[in-house]
Amino acid sequence: MIDLKRNTKGEYVEATGLNSQKWRIYQPNQKKNFKISRSRFGEFKDCPRCFYLRLVKGLQSPGMPQFKLNELTDTLLKKEFDECRKIQKPHRKLIEDGLEHIVPYDAGITKIINSKKEEKEWQIIDVWRESKNHGLKYKFKDTNIILQGGIDDVWLNTKTKELIVVDYKSQASPKEVSQDTYFDKSGYHGSYKTQLDFYAYLMKGMNLEYGISNDSYLYVVNGLDVEEGFNAEIKFSETLIHHKIETDYLDHEIQNMIDTINSDKIPDSNKSCKNCAYARQRSVIDTLGDVN
């Protein structure tokens, strides 16, 4: 896609291809603490070269469109679960699926200093959700890397007293959402497993009052193509997709990511990376002209 750069006023400005926010650029072997988000870790797994060029060299890749409808469904689901959180009752979908022993986790209230240096009270679940400045945080071992991620929700298993990682997903597919097929033959659905594992890994490192469950869930809402038409409303199916948490592999992969950014050598690209393939072909044409 073509992405045109605008300033905060919505006016078109020159795109340099470089990140002007120097604090977002990592210097190999720097001593100062540096935050790496769950999405950046996902980029490392997808293509180490693109990840390195963004984080260390400061290249700014074209942006992706914001999916406002997906954001809206997330917001509405959070409102539903927050109402259940206040009274510590299971959500209607949990009751429907025979999971009455699970309730939205009430982590309490904390105080946060905002950008205006004002102290404000926040629900802790909202701190964990706010990925830009807060979120779940864990400093990786004895390094300067702070791992970070904004989670959609956390539930509590009242029987085992364990916390459950939850992420909301919105889609529109003619196929029925099913536990048996959801993770089959889909690269990006498979990446959701890593997302859940990563959140659980962070929570384990945060030493919370409860242990972290090996059970996690995707709350998938799927827009339905109904015969009667639009009529100013969209109907959704709702499905809980279960994932058994695995975090043992993350120590090695995170350390590999840190070793990569502490090296002066730019890593090889993923051979399936379309961004790298486009960059190579564009470079040839820009340098030599049309070679076909």
Q: What is each model feature region?
A:
Residues 1-159, 288:
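Metal-dependent nuclease catalytic cores that hydrolyze phosphodiester bonds in DNA/RNA
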Residues 2-19, 27-29, 36, 202-292:
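Metal-dependent nuclease catalytic regions and adjoining charged, substrate-binding loops involved
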Residues 30-32, 61, 173-180, 252-258:
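Short amphipathic alpha-helical segments and their helix-coil junctions
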Residues 52-53, 60-62, 172-176, 224-228, ...:
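Short catalytic/ligand-binding loop motif for oxyanion handling, primarily in non-cytosolic enzymes
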Residues 64, 186-190, 272-276:
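Serine-centered coil/turn micro-motif
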Residues 80-83, 198, 202, 256:
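Amphipathic alpha-helical segments that form well-ordered structural scaffolds
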Residues 130-252:
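Mg2+/Mn2+-dependent nuclease catalytic core
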